[in-house]
Amino acid sequence: IRDRFQMGGKFGAVSFLQIVAPELSDRMLADFMDAENGIIVNLHIQSIDHNEAIKTIKRKITDLDRMKIEEQKKAIRSGYDMDIIPSDLATYGGEAKNLLRDLQSRNERMFLLTLLVLNLADTKQKLDNEVFGAAAIAQKYNCILTRLDYRQEQGLMSSIPLGENLIHIQRGLTTSSLSLIHISEPTR
């Protein structure tokens, strides 16, 4: 089945968290843990070599600068002001330069994070409701929870405590962004 699995008498679905927000809030994790249903949250965190992270960010800045030049050329050909570039391009360029500065001067390190959410329920309907509830929690914190279509088995294997991540949908975070996550016992 495309977006769920069945194991014994339980139905399950694994989703990944697409982190759109610039930082990850530990309050979101607490909200997931406070949910009154069968939910398992998995964080796979991989450290990146410091020099490699700097090289990667420099390449990204070069790519963004190249895209900016192409946009400026298009604007000139179309008779527009060349200083007007798409806002996303300007935003990403600024963020990449800030990230490079942080890596070079603030002793920040770079990490890759995969955050998976496993929902379990007794019926398909209850599973769908619980996945919907988990997606609402993610949305509250400017994140998107997306089911792993056709990759439920890999998601399940990545959710059991073997330390193996078979889902390589990752988001780069710095030390300070990652340190905002305080794993603790949920409050009841």
What annotation goes with each model-predicted range?
Residues 1-180:
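Extended, folded cores of ATP/NTP-driven motor/assembly subunits in large transport
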Residues 179-187:
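Residue-level detector of conserved catalytic or cofactor/ligand-binding positions
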